[in-house]
């Protein structure tokens, strides 16, 4: 069993005079993590699947690595946030000149009129392609159902016709029976007398000399036999219906969206909203602790503001943030999902207390999703996410307030108001729903969709990365040019590719990105193994370059660090 100890090293390293911590084993071997900031130090914490280094976090966290302690600390912090606090005062962005000027930027109706004919023409073309795919899909399904009917008919005969005939015959015998011996409910009624044709019927005729009473008993016996046969035929009919339903459920490719469907209406509204470049998109992703879903570990935010993208540019400008909650810092997922909280690809991750995380998020929401000026009110606003309703519920549990009509948190999941949005309407744009309404449920995870449309990605299940990829995926879903080049409207072709990937997933091993912590650990082992071997080659560590984690005492300080220094 290895015993570990913390060693404080105050040695100078060039111009970096910051204190750093080093975790060593008894044999002196172990990775060294130096602070790259001017903060007073960094705490390296040994975790189940790697060492986590946080620049600027110097307080003693002894014992907090225990799961129960971290969970308790998070839940206690969440309980304290349930007390009333003034969310409206989270508005530091309105104190920064750059963001003040953005609020004075109005949506251009002239540009909107120029874009509209192009969007209308594309949607008309999209309708035709979806209808064609829908027609082909339905024709294939009907052919398969007809084949099931034919095979069933060869074995069982025409069950439906047999059942209809038998039910009609039973109905006739029931009328005869009720006429001979009227039931109590019909004794007061005047029933039609039996005719010669009734008595000579081919189902259960009355022989000459047979009394009505005996004939009644014969009819009852005949009806009893019919009841058994009818039940048998009904069972066979139900089995046929079940088999056809099974064919419908398992049929591939099943296209649901066509030009008159609710699915297509949702797709069209999303595309029109985004292609008009009217919508300010606030994308969210939450990562929770796998053994206690009440505990949030990471929050990722990516924002696309069309006001920052009005000047023609080849690259869309987005604002990206990755927040790690201090109380749950040491909680690492590993059993069900990979933990990549220290693998943020878009810069530094900010370690904040739960309270300051809430202030950070609320400040962004209050700026981007709550209009203040008249120019502000000319823009639409939307939450974006992959199954975003779950992320919104998580944020509600920690006290984040969402805008809507009357600022009461009424969010529009249906896009019914997308064509005539009000000042306070906030739409819900969901990449999972968009995909499913287009291509069905198979392959609807974020990673599989990104892979399907050849969108580069890595280190999913880092909340910051997921938010960024989700936002860009939705923008590509609604980008007319990307849809044309990628063939997104050839629904059957896309669904065929989904099937191919599904078959490959069964045959091939799952590819999982290697955490840089593991890379460093392997490098240390290699150095130990090669000890004493001289080499002119400089030692290398194979890893992805990340921005690392930095601790901030307040949300405002964390946000201020993102602003340009000039």
Swiss-Prot record:
Residues 1-41 are annotated as: Disordered. InterPro entries: Gfd2/YDR514C-like, Gfd2/YDR514C-like_C, RNaseH-like_sf, RNaseH_sf. Pfam families: DEDDh_C (PF21762). One of its GO terms (molecular function) is nucleic acid binding. Residues 1-16 have a biased composition (Polar residues). High-copy suppressor of DBP5 mutation. This is Good for full DBP5 activity protein 2. The gene is GFD2.
